[in-house]
Amino acid sequence: MDTLEPTAVDTHVSAEQILRDVYKKGQKARGSTNIDILDLEELREYQRRKRTEYEGYLKRNRLDMGQWIRYAQFEIEQHDMRRARSIFERALLVDSSFIPLWIRYIDAELKVKCINHARNLMNRAISTLPRVDKLWYKYLIVEESLNNVEIVRSLYTKWCSLEPGVNAWNSFVDFEIRQKNWNGVREIYSKYVMAHPQMQTWLKWVRFENRHGNTEFTRSVYSLAIDTVANLQNLQIWSDMEVAKLVNSFAHWEAAQQEYERSSALYQIAIEKWPSNQLLKAGLLDFEKQFGDINSIEETISYKRKMEYETILSNNAYDYDTWWLYLDLISESFPKQIMQTFEKAIVDSRPKELSKNVQWKRYIYLWMRYICYVELELENSLLEEELFQRLIDDIIPHKHFTFSKIWLMYAKFLIRHDDVPKARKILGKAIGLCPKAKTFKGYIELEVKLKEFDRVRKIYEKFIEFQPSDLQIWSQYGELEENLGDWDRVRGIYTIALDENSDFLTKEAKIVLLQKYITFETESQEFEKARKLYRRYLELNQYSPQSWIEFAMYQTSTPTEQQLLDLAKLQSENVDEDIEFEITDENKLEARKVFEEAIVFFKEKDDKQGRLSILEALKDYEETYGTELDQETVKKRFPKVIKKVRLQNGVEEEFVDYIFPDDIDDDKPKPSKFLELAKKWKQEQAL
């Protein structure tokens, strides 16, 4: 019988199928070897062999506690509890601190209902490892499940005598609550709060008394807690927040019992005991808001805050945040003291340093608030001007630094009061004493609003003298003249900034400014001037491929001189119609000239990568604007990629080189001029 050969399709197995099969095989659990034991002799032989294996392994690695547990479990399965106990005991001699070993040993005794053995074992466990909570809980659960209440209570008492963590105490409390032994719970809490005197412990006791006790018990617990906190405050066990939490809880509980006088007295005593605790004061205010008179509450709050702020400021006169809050309070609650407070603020908080820092800035903001208050609330212009003069002449050290905001505020104040000449003098003085860019900009903005453009030009000239390296100044000056329609001034500004001999602007800044210049000439329809600027743009960009491409695209999108004349003629003939510029073959030709010029430039520089970039751009250009013949012509000019090897520092390395078809054509010998003339004469004779 002929056998069929499997086809390639039949034998093909994908990697995915292989992985799936392996995964499925891995998922299948390997079954343990089944041993059939037929008689007692075979059982003895099996037990002997397994014991030999366990003993041999434990001789090699006696610290493997898991193996000890498995060995003991094997003996338990063989119903040989005597051997199992022996193994557990041997394991405990190796490592008595291994908790799972104790648990398995105890569970083994419990499973065979050897309660006394288990109890003795648990006694040993908690004696050997008294700080392991798990062993205590195991013992307690067993005894409580057997309903041995007294044993459980004695165990808890013994455990808590070691001052364990809060979980042990909480468990003891929960146990006594389950037994409804309320006095026992109180006795536990009396020891609990000594071992763990945290505020949370006291509050737990209070919650217990609220639920299971009476008013007197609850009040006594609160009182005991307050006394304890007061007597042990030097130990710094409790934070201000915890103290306030306890007092607030006590006071609100008294209020719930309608003992409002007790609550108020409690707050007063607590504040006297902890005068720096702001949370207590806040709690008192909250209490008064609920149970006090409105007017008394507001006055109490205001005076209390005033005293607090004055205390803070007497300790640190440079706390400007507190000065602001203090001024807010005085203006709202004590308006008659506001002027005196302002004077005190600007005198006491004046910085001593002669360097501009955050402290000086915040101090000046106090002055600004004072000045704004005088103008808006008092409407006293004379006093306001005096404050400005005082601030400028006596406060700010202009030889070291100044604040432009103050000069500009003063100038705007004078303009609002129709004193423009003095405002100009003030800003001129600011520029003369300590010139700053912000002062110049503010001065320019004011003069622009006043439409004094000649003055604006003079300020810009001073500004440029002060900071000639700031590109933004040149740009804004040019935009100003452009908006005013003075084209010659715009060109003059750009020309001075872009002068080849000037070094105050970086090359990057000049490139940005030159782009603005090109945009300006383009919008002015001075396309030839823009093209000349593009030549400078190429130079500043070090004739990068991108700059050549931008130049070529500019040639496409802008009309030539002849096209401008034609457009003007058409516009004159069709006055009512808008004539739009359309890209013609002439524009495409100018763009191709730029591309070709770039190719020649990179060819002469032997920059093959740059040359390739230009060809790729030309290819994209022809796909948009060219014919199929143009596109094929460009594709034929693309280089052939060749991998070469060169020796670099004694090591051969592979690099990519480009062979351009144009270079190959240039290397071919050109036909003789005489032969070309002869061929041409022969063609003419044939005609």
Swiss-Prot record:
Molecular function via GO: chromatin binding; DNA replication origin binding
Biological process terms in GO annotation: cis assembly of pre-catalytic spliceosome; DNA replication initiation; mRNA splicing, via spliceosome; spliceosomal complex assembly
Keywords: mRNA processing, mRNA splicing, Nucleus, Repeat, Spliceosome
One Gene Ontology CC term in the entry: U2-type catalytic step 1 spliceosome
InterPro entries documented for this protein: HAT (IPR003107), HAT_Syf1-like_N (IPR055433), HAT_Syf1_CNRKL1_C (IPR055430), Syf1-like (IPR045075), TPR-like_helical_dom_sf (IPR011990)
Compartment(s): Nucleus
Pfam family, one: HAT_Syf1_CNRKL1_C
HAT repeats: 45-77, 79-111, 113-145, 147-178, 180-211, 213-247, 251-283, 300-332, 337-369, 383-416, 451-483, 525-557, 629-661
Family label: Belongs to the crooked-neck family.
Assembly: Belongs to the NTC complex (or PRP19-associated complex), composed of at least CEF1, CLF1, ISY1, NTC20, SNT309, SYF1, SYF2, and PRP19.
Additional remark text: Present with 2140 molecules/cell in log phase SD medium.
Its job: Involved in pre-mRNA splicing and cell cycle progression. Required for the spliceosome assembly by promoting the functional integration of the U4/U6.U5 tri-snRNP particle into the U1-, U2-dependent pre-spliceosome. Also recruits PRP19 to the spliceosome, as a component of the NTC complex (or PRP19-associated complex). The association of the NTC complex to the spliceosome mediates conformational rearrangement or stabilizes the structure of the spliceosome after U4 snRNA dissociation, which leads to spliceosome maturation.
Family matches, as PANTHER family: CROOKED NECK-LIKE PROTEIN 1, PRE-MRNA SPLICING FACTOR
Protein name: Pre-mRNA-splicing factor CLF1
Source organism (scientific name): Saccharomyces cerevisiae (strain ATCC 204508 / S288c)
